[in-house]
């Protein structure tokens, strides 16, 4: 590949050639031209950046100062507001406590007045019913005495029961007493019938409790009956058959 040929301009330096005197005059009149130091593009960029950064830093610092001032003002306002709020809350609490205490006092006064009225109303009723109340108390005492009397009666009944049992205990039967009967024929003693003997043998418990035994009967019971002869026994059998 062949490279393209560049266009080149031909410069004629003859046009710019002047006399030596002119050069000398020019050199005397004007001093050597001051050379300007060209700064590299990197340095220019750095300067621009540094300038921008400095401006940004200054703006940031100003904004920060403004913010700090605002914050200080806000904090002062907030502190004042908080103080006022605390004061308001305290005042509200104090007012609520005072109102509650007043309500309690009013209620206590109302209750006390009602109780006084009730006591005044109940006083005449109590005076009227005092006698009946005493009677009622006496009746209560009577009831208590009645309960104690019941207990005493129960104790007495319990004590009397064993005595009755002792009375009911069977006593030894008394032996039949032999009494002489009127003579029927030939002047001989007749023997009592079996029915009479049985009646005499079984006395009633009432009679046993009421009538004490006589000493004669005890002696007769202790002595054995007399023995009879054979003739008397036959006569007794005949009499029982006739009956």
Swiss-Prot record:
Phosphorylated in an ATM-dependent manner in response to DNA damage. Phosphorylated by CDK1 and casein kinase. The keyword Phosphoprotein applies. One of its GO terms (molecular function) is double-stranded DNA binding. Residues 1-243 are annotated as: Disordered. Its main location: nucleus. InterPro entries: HR_DNA-Binding_Protein. The modification Phosphothreonine is found at residues 179, 202. Residues 64-77, 197-206 have a biased composition (Basic and acidic residues). It is found in: Nucleus; Chromosome. Keywords: Chromosome, DNA damage, DNA repair, Nucleus, Phosphoprotein. The modification Phosphoserine is found at residues 14, 19, 54, 58, 61, 73, 75, 79, 113, 130, 132, 144, 181, 204, 214, 223, 229, 234, 240. Residues 91-100 have a biased composition (Low complexity). Residues 111-124, 132-145, 232-243 have a biased composition (Acidic residues). The keyword Zinc-finger does not apply. The modification Phosphotyrosine is found at residues 13, 26. One of its GO terms (biological process) is interstrand cross-link repair. GO terms for cellular component: chromosome; cytoplasm; nucleus. Residues 35-51, 149-174 have a biased composition (Basic residues). Does not interact with RAD51. Chromatin-associated protein involved in DNA repair by promoting homologous recombination (HR). Binds double-stranded DNA (dsDNA) and secondary DNA structures, such as D-loop structures, but with less affinity than RAD51AP1. This is Nuclear ubiquitous casein and cyclin-dependent kinase substrate 1. The gene is NUCKS1.
């Amino acid at each position: 590949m062949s490279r393209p040929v560049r266009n080149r301009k031909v410069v004629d330096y003859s046009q710019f050639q002047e006399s030596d005197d002119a050069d000398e005059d020019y050199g005397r009149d004007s001093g050597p031209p001051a050379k300007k130091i060209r700064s590299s593009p990197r340095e220019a960029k750095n300067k621009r950046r540094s300038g921008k950064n400095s401006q940004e830093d200054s703006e940031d610092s100003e904004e920060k100062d403004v913010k700090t001032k605002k914050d200080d003002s806000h904090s002062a306002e907030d502190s004042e507001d908080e103080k006022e709020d605390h004061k308001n809350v305290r005042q509200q609490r104090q007012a609520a406590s005072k109102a509650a205490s007043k309500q309690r006092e009013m209620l206590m006064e109302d209750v006390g007045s009602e109780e006084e009225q009730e006591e005044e109303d109940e006083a005449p009723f109590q005076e009227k019913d005092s006698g009946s109340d005493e009677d009622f108390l006496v009746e209560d005492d009577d009831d208590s005495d009645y309960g104690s009397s019941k207990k005493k009666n129960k104790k007495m009944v319990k004590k009397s029961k064993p005595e009755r049992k002792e009375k009911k205990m069977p006593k030894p039967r008394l032996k039949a007493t032999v009494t002489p009967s009127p003579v029927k024929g030939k002047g001989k003693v007749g023997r009592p019938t079996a029915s009479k003997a049985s009646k005499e043998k079984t006395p009633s418990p009432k009679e046993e409790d009421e009538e004490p035994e006589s000493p004669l009967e005890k002696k007769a019971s202790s002595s054995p009956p007399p023995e009879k002869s054979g003739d008397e026994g036959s006569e007794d059998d005949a009499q029982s058959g006739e009956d």
